Amino acid sequence: MRIGKAAEDLACEYLVRNGHTVVERNWRSGHLEIDIITLDSAGIHFVEVKGRVAPVTADPEENVGYRKQRRLASAARAYLNSEDKKSLIDQKEAFFDVFSVIFEGGKAEVKYFPQAYIPINT
């Protein structure tokens, strides 16, 4: 199984267990992509998933830098502005979350960072 897909599967399972409803996976528009989009009682979540196989030199979540954050914010805006998604704009809040998975010896270490960042000037 592909590392990215396995990490996204774990992220979806975790999020559903914690009150989220998954509405999209691997949403794309041109060069923009969002790994997972969920809804919960607080609003809509745009989730970036990072998966790595141990040993790692840096935690996967550290790979969501400023440029990636800007691209994700642009993707979220494109998603919400698409004609069939306009009703989601009524959600209370939009959140940008990061989900990290490190695979080692048949086990997975998962970390969820809700509201990992707030996009600015996108």
Indicate residue ranges for each PLM-predicted region.
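Short, low-complexity, polybasic intrinsically disordered segments
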Residues: S100-T122
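Hydrophobic "anchor" residues on beta-strands that sit immediately upstream
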Residues: T21, I44, E93
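Protein kinase-like catalytic core scaffold
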Residues: L32, H45, F95-D97, K111
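Short acidic/glycine-enriched loop/turn segments that link adjacent beta-strands
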Residues: S29-L32, G106
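Conserved catalytic cores of phosphodiester-cleaving nucleases, focusing on short active-site segments
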Residues: I34-T57, L72
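Acidic-basic catalytic patches of nuclease active cores, encompassing PD-(D/E)XK
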Residues: M1-N26
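Catalytic cores of nucleic-acid endonucleases
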Residues: G51-E104
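Short, glycine/acidic-enriched loop or turn micro-motifs at the edges of active sites
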Residues: W27-S29, G51
